[in-house]
């Protein structure tokens, strides 16, 4: 099962109307197929649960999708070396300088020649659609990767009205108060990692293995620094980095949580996949609800 390592959360501004069959049909329009010899890249949906033909995995009102991107790796210096050699030979042969359009045509030939021998870089991005709460969670550490996956879903469905989830109260202000006033919510425990910043000219201070209750940190906060990233733990469930933009990074689920389904035989892969998905989505749904409560709910959209 794909245990999410990062969370970028999006609000569906309009409910999606689909059935399991219509969703499968829509996803098949953008199904992933491996690169052929002449392909630079391929991007599409693959099976979340291996061994099945379904391009989505559903339990109740929770849906899991898996986007697969394959990119051929052609080092620029390899292309450049081969291209320069060909240009030199042709210019000597014809005793003239090649035009720009001719050089581009040669470059295209070089790329076509090298592609079949190029290695592939494969990357998968998981998306979880919570149709009950109208949220989409993307396991991505960068906005571009998340937006690429959402664009693929939008292409498959025809439309996808989403906006990033935002809290009503500024996370940096609230997180700073937690540490400055020693008032972290009872269900959360601050760990020894944070990032602080002030004005644009004051730079960024990154703290690791640092007691956030220390005099050094208090001095920085009293001087007007704000906490923009904070490492937190939810006891017996998971730890994560909470960012000021409402994204979560470096999710690490507690061993005692991940072991809850160990009574299911390893041979029964589908049942374990199902149970782990239910477990993970249950924890993250509650985490989202808790964070929304701590930060004053969801920011009103204009």
From Swiss-Prot:
* UniProt xrefs under Pfam families: RdgC
Q: Which domain of life is it from?
A: Bacteria
Q: Which residues form a coiled coil?
A: none
Tell me the Gene Ontology biological-process terms attached to this UniProt entry: DNA recombination; regulation of DNA recombination
Q: Keywords of this protein's UniProt record, alphabetized?
A: Cytoplasm, DNA recombination
InterPro entries according to UniProt: RdgC
The record's GO CC annotations read: bacterial nucleoid; cytoplasm
One Gene Ontology molecular-function label: double-stranded DNA binding
* Keyword Cell division tagged: no
Question: Which NCBIfam families does the record match to this protein?
Answer: PRK00321.1-3, PRK00321.1-5
Q: Which PANTHER family match?
A: RECOMBINATION-ASSOCIATED PROTEIN RDGC (PTHR38103:SF1)
Give the similarity note. Answer: Belongs to the RdgC family.
**Purpose:** May be involved in recombination.
This protein is called what? Answer: Recombination-associated protein RdgC
What organism is the protein native to? Pasteurella multocida (strain Pm70)
